[in-house]
Amino acid sequence: MVSFASETKKELTNLEMKECCEKAELSALLRMNGSLSFSNRRLSIDIQTENAAIARRIYTLLKKGYDVTVELLVRKKMRLKKNNVYIVRLVEKSREILADLHIVRDDFSFIRNISQELIEKKCCKRSYLRGAFLAGGSVNNPETSSYHLEIFSLYKEHNDAICELMNGFDLNSKTLERRKGYITYLKEAEKITEFLNIIGAHNALLRFEDIRIVRDMRNSVNRLVNCETANLNKTIGAALRQIENIRYIDETVGLDILPDKLREIAQLRRDYQDVTLKELGEMVSGGKISKSGINHRLRKIDDIAEKLRAGETVAKK
């Protein structure tokens, strides 16, 4: 079964972009999924992913943006799930492309944060976040017990930059150190849907919201049922206690010990055990009595039963 995160990423790889946005997205993809190697005195870049659609996206962006020779390799993992691993290999103009994408400086030292030149425009900010999500992002299926979206970064500076970029859209993202790197994450459902909208995953957003609405409605119904059940149990418990106290009084000293108004209620409760307090109030001979009035008289009967259990003498008033 395809995961919600995989479906979201597949949708993102089909989006059309402006040229400036292509550069921002590609920079995030290469920075986060790329690795460098030297062979025969030549620098090459391998961009690795387990998602075929993302591999095609990287391949297309490199060919379109730089008109270079790009190799696409497929390998199978031998451990765990044994998924295919797709490697997009760039074997020419590697240094120039890394510099153009603001991943390395002229002296070939790495730039750990996000260059402002890449994200001057709002559309480019969105595209960089899209590339970062494609490269290192994950999002829980909204049907699971908790909402969670995160983007993993190897370096703290870059992770902090992603967090700052996300919070420029008022997403209230937070950072956390993991064993092998850092993450920027969202826990609020509303913020996750906002993020999906920002990066252009509109179909995923609609699916997320549909599932969330159904889930929240189901939870509301469950809470209502639980509340009603608790109230019903409380009502049943009170009725059983009242009947037991009335029987105790009757068997110990007789119901005649009770004042007339209390005795009538005691007899009604004993004879009509399944009726509600409202229905009891409608049965009283002297005229209708409210639920609170019936409850007050039943509490007095409870008090008399407790006094009898404690060995006190109860006289008819």
UniProtKB/Swiss-Prot annotation:
GO molecular function: DNA binding
DNA-binding region: 276-310
Hydrolase keyword on record: no
Biological process annotations from GO: cell division; regulation of sporulation
InterPro entries per the UniProt record, alphabetical: Homing_endonucl, Sporu_reg_WhiA_N_dom, Sporulation_regulator_WhiA, Sporulation_regulator_WhiA_C, WhiA_LAGLIDADG_dom
The UniProt record lists the keyword Zinc: no
UniProt keywords, alphabetically: Cell cycle, Cell division, DNA-binding
Pfam families cross-referenced by the UniProt entry: HTH_WhiA (PF02650), LAGLIDADG_WhiA (PF14527), WhiA_N (PF10298)
Family: Belongs to the WhiA family.
Database matches in PANTHER family: CELL DIVISION PROTEIN WHIA-RELATED
Classification via HAMAP family: HTH_type_WhiA
UniProt cross-references to NCBIfam families, sorted A to Z: DNA_bind_WhiA
Name by which UniProt lists this protein: Probable cell division protein WhiA
